[in-house]
Amino acid sequence: MLTSYVKVLEQNNLRLTKPRIALLKCLIEHQDWHNLSQIKTHLDLANQPSTLASIYNNLRILAKLKLINIFVDPERFETYYCLRHAEHNHIYLFDEVKQQFFTLPLTDGQIKTLLETQNHTSKVKLNDFYIVARGEINND
């Protein structure tokens, strides 16, 4: 899996620095959504210490290359990062109690049905489509 991400870096003439490779390995190993401080903790625990500035700069590079997804929680002003896999459609549900994301995949047909109800089908090109919902998971 790392090889495909490294290939994108090489194709874009980016150096394969130790911090950049360590960040990719971290995101591969921890395939959930994480904020900047959580990523730093993962790297520190893996004996790959890095500064927050270096992590942030590398995340920006990975985002520009469309290797990661970014979600900003407007209520907390918190940014979350997740490694991007194959293009596919999702609803992301952020559980307020557990402070974590759950992913619900959608088919193109389901997305088109959602868009048709809002008369947006002619305006949207489906490459990736994300719906982010916030709430609480009730297991009753």
Curated annotation (Swiss-Prot):
SUPFAM superfamilies: Winged helix' DNA-binding domain
Gene3D superfamilies reported for this sequence: Winged helix-like DNA-binding domain superfamily/Winged helix DNA-binding domain (1.10.10.10)
GO BP terms: negative regulation of DNA-templated transcription; regulation of secondary metabolite biosynthetic process
Coiled coil (UniProt feature): none
First and last residue of the signal peptide: none
Transmembrane segments: none
Pfam family, one: FUR
InterPro entries xref list: FUR (IPR002481), WH-like_DNA-bd_sf (IPR036388), WH_DNA-bd_sf (IPR036390)
A GO MF label: zinc ion binding
Name of the molecule in the record: Uncharacterized protein MG236
Origin species: Mycoplasma genitalium (strain ATCC 33530 / DSM 19775 / NCTC 10195 / G37) (Mycoplasmoides genitalium)
